[in-house]
């Protein structure tokens, strides 16, 4: 399951390897971008094209996995509208692979064969609205429909019990696409072409099989194994829909950096997937997205303006053929935008084509690291500031929290948030309230605690005042040495469950501008206040 940003006001969680999140990278500001107006999220019906409509929905078959007991009956709170079934009857769950807003992904072993798979366990507490439940069923339907195709994760089946919907699928043990590129330490146009070819192949397969993806981004691609020549696999179809011939789509969904201009204008078709793939190619070649700003509004403005930078480094050293393909994929007019089939035949992209084997500037890898990892430390620092902020500074927010937390439990539930927003005069739909809930719920436990609420609602300039930044710095600087060492950073990040060893080292490397192996106060403040591709988080209210 995932989020769209029909109107997203909240603090977003970082994308993690193997998780179930599909968050918008940055949230909506208090002003809406031009050329579009917020509206309630609408969900396309999971109708299959062609004669397939005469068959039972694939998700029914997926839910009715081998071993289903004929004595079990469908429960009233069923999401899949089928009998409950314990996934542990067929699979042994192992270690946690990733955690996201909607649940946890585990390594699992099939009891009958001993084969390893991934099990994405999605908490039913997170599936609150009718739209959530429809989306869940549609995601299963689409995954089963596409399963078995190259570069698309193989889907095994869906199992629902009282607490969760469990999706069992192919284990992609090679990790995230960008992690592999960064770890190699060197990179060529030919390597970028190989990656892009597989991503566009996913687009071609989806469109051929009647599916519009709508959320192509690097985080949604994993590597099938740790092998050097491992296939890239698309793993997330939570925002995908079946294409209806002649239908004009109007939902604003996706992730900010990768959204096509026609999505913002609420009139689009399958061409949006080519645009998103073009954004990924631009990042592969340069290390940064072509459109970014301090706010989501700024990103949208840049997308609608349409200026693409081919002058800054490393573009002067990138081949003209590569730039030609990027331009064709990022053509603003969807009618003139290149098709998936034509992308695959482009001289630069096709196998054995013009893409050079000459290494791309190492700065590109550095930028990719920043693009992927920087926000984790910023987010943790903001949480630390919120935990230690003076009570008098947040008296109003404290009262607001108490008013919304009607049962005095110390946490805000979905229902409490919905009622609280209504009292404040909000006219958000249930789906939009749910998005706010997911955005502010940093630890993913289904409710917003006091610190999460303060972090999401305080004005950012107050959180980032000199006094508060210094308090946060002191929190990390445990030995009061005036520096945050790698050990202190590792301890802090792991305390909050954020980041593996590789990410910790990447964060230190990105922030440590004088390369002395530690972070001083000036470097810390510069990191907190600088504009970078992982943007600052907006307010909940």
Curated annotation (Swiss-Prot):
Binding annotation for Ca(2+) 3: 477, 479, 481, 483, 488
SMART domains the UniProt entry points to: EFh, S_TKc
Active site: 215
Lipid tethering residues (N-myristoyl glycine): 2
Protein kinase domain location: 91-349
Its job: May play a role in signal transduction pathways that involve calcium as a second messenger.
Protein known as: Calcium-dependent protein kinase 9
Organism of derivation: Arabidopsis thaliana
Gene name tied to this protein: CPK9
């Amino acid at each position: 399951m995932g989020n769209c940003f029909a109107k997203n006001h909240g603090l977003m969680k970082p994308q993690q390897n193997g998780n179930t999140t599909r968050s918008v990278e940055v949230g909506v500001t208090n002003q809406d971008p031009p050329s579009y107006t917020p509206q309630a999220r609408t969900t396309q019906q999971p109708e299959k094209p062609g004669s397939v409509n005469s068959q039972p929905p694939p998700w029914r078959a997926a839910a009715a996995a081998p071993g289903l007991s004929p004595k079990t009956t469908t429960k009233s709170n069923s999401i899949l509208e089928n009998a409950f079934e314990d996934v542990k009857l067929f699979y042994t769950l192992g270690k946690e692979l990733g955690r996201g807003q909607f649940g946890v992904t585990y390594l699992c072993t099939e009891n009958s064969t001993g084969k390893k798979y991934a099990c994405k366990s999605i908490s039913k507490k997170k599936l609150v609205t009718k739209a959530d439940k429809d989306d869940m069923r549609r995601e299963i339907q689409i995954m089963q429909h596409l399963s078995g195709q190259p570069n698309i994760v193989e889907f095994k089946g869906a199992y629902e019990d009282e607490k969760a919907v469990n999706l069992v699928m192919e284990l992609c043990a090679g990790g995230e696409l960008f992690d592999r590129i960064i770890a190699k330490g060197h990179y060529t146009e030919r390597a970028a072409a190989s990656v892009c070819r597989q991503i566009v192949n996913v687009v071609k397969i989806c469109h051929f099989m009647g599916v519009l993806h709508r959320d192509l981004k690097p985080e949604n691609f994993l590597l099938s194994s740790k092998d050097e020549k491992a296939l890239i696999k698309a793993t997330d179809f939570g925002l995908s829909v079946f294409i209806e011939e002649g239908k004009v789509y109007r939902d604003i969904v996706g992730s900010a950096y990768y959204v096509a201009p026609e999505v913002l204008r609420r009139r689009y078709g399958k061409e949006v997937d080519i645009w998103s793939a073009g954004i990924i190619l631009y990042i592969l070649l340069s290390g940064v997205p072509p459109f970014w700003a301090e706010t989501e509004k700024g990103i949208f403005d840049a997308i609608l303006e349409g200026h693409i930078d081919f002058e800054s480094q490393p573009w002067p050293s990138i081949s003209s053929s590569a730039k030609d393909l990027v331009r064709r994929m990022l053509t603003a007019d969807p009618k003139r935008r290149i098709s998936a089939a034509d992308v695959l035949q482009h001289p630069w992209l096709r196998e054995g084509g013009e893409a050079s084997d000459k290494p791309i500037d190492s700065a590109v890898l550095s930028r990719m690291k920043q693009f992927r990892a920087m926000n984790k430390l910023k987010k943790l620092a903001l949480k630390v500031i919120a935990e230690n902020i003076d009570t008098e500074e947040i008296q109003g927010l404290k009262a607001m929290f108490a008013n919304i937390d009607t049962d005095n439990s110390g946490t805000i539930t979905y229902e409490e948030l919905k009622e609280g927003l209504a009292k404040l005069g909000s006219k958000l739909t249930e789906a939009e309230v749910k998005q706010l809930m997911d955005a502010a719920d940093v630890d993913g436990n289904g409710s917003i605690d006091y610190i999460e609420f303060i972090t999401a609602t305080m004005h950012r300039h107050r959180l980032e005042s000199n006094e508060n930044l210094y308090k946060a710095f002191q929190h990390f600087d445990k030995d009061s040495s005036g520096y945050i060492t790698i050990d202190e950073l590792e301890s802090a990040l792991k305390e909050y469950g954020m980041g593996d060893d590789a990410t910790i080292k990447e964060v230190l490397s990105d922030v440590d501008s004088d390369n002395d192996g530690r972070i001083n106060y000036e470097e810390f403040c510069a990191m907190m206040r600088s504009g970078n591709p992982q943007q600052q988080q907006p307010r909940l209210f």
